[in-house]
Amino acid sequence: MCIRDSLWVASSDYTVDVRAGKNIFKQLSEAYRKMRNTARFMLGNIGDFNPATDMVAEDQLFEIDRWALKSCNSLTANVRAAYDNYDFSRAYHAIYNFCVIDMSNFYMDVIKDRLYCADEHARRCAQTALYRILVDFTKLVAPILCFTAQEIWSYIPKLEGMQEYVCWERMPEAKSDEDAAFDAKWAKIIAVRDDVKKVLEQARADKTIGSSLEAAVTLYCNDEMYDFLNAIPMDELADLMIVSHVDLVKGEGGVRGLTEGLGMSVAHAAGNKCLRCWKFDTAVGEDGLCPRCAKVLG
């Protein structure tokens, strides 16, 4: 109740009449759960992460990890500006959208497989990004969710110099990280992913597949789109789409989406389902594991 009320105050635009009601409080309770669950996912996946010894340098991170850090940096800039102008509603909505759109619906969904199945370096890259994002996120949310922020902070592994209480920490500073080419590249990747998601939803409706990991996606590309997507390792592209397999084909075909020069088709992936990662692979063994998961389990 207290948390819901504090979110109601923070989310309200005090320059106009403030509304209150059961539906509004219900929506805020759901928003709080989304923000809390975002933090819980990050905490749950850095349990074995020691920031003093396991942190990976930013230039060695996967591109999607750097994208997530840039997204968090943009959040920092927006929230700091909102707090400086006492615009708590703007800060709240920026934090909420970051949790739902950037983290839950995209980044955290994509890296789950890497956190559970990848080699040590790939996993540490994802953990590094999660750790850095969680530290900044907790500081940013503290002014409007002080008790939740302190609860999160108490579980975060501390580097030397970090305070016991989050309210004693300085707010994170937004860095100057303008990279138009990087931003344009990832905007294009996300647009392709959004188109593929729509085709996957139709394939589910047609009973071609159940979950997206049952899918093998063929992307029909013009020359420019082929070169763009072919520069991304196919296993990373499959992870971005959350499917078992991706093929690139030059030429027209499949269902057209909003992305220029791209057509898509979906079929059921070949092979059997790995009992650990749930991806379909023709090399799944008698133990029900794909070679990658068998290697992880030793």
Where are these regions (language model features)?
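Short cysteine-rich clusters marking metal-coordination/redox-active sites
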Residues: 274, 290-293
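Core structural elements
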Residues: 30-43, 63-75, 93-113
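Structured ligand/cofactor/substrate-binding pocket environments in proteins
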Residues: 4-6, 18-43, 93-96, 125-150
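Short, intrinsically disordered, charge-biased short linear motifs at domain edges
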Residues: 259-266, 273-283
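Short helix-adjacent coil turns
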Residues: 83-90
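Catalytic adenosine-cofactor/nucleotide-binding cores of aminoacyl-tRNA synthetases and other
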Residues: 4-59, 157-162, 208-209
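Cys/His-rich microdomains that often coordinate metals
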Residues: 281-284, 294-297
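Acidic, turn-prone loop/beta-hairpin segments
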Residues: 49-77, 109-199, 203-227, 247-250, ...
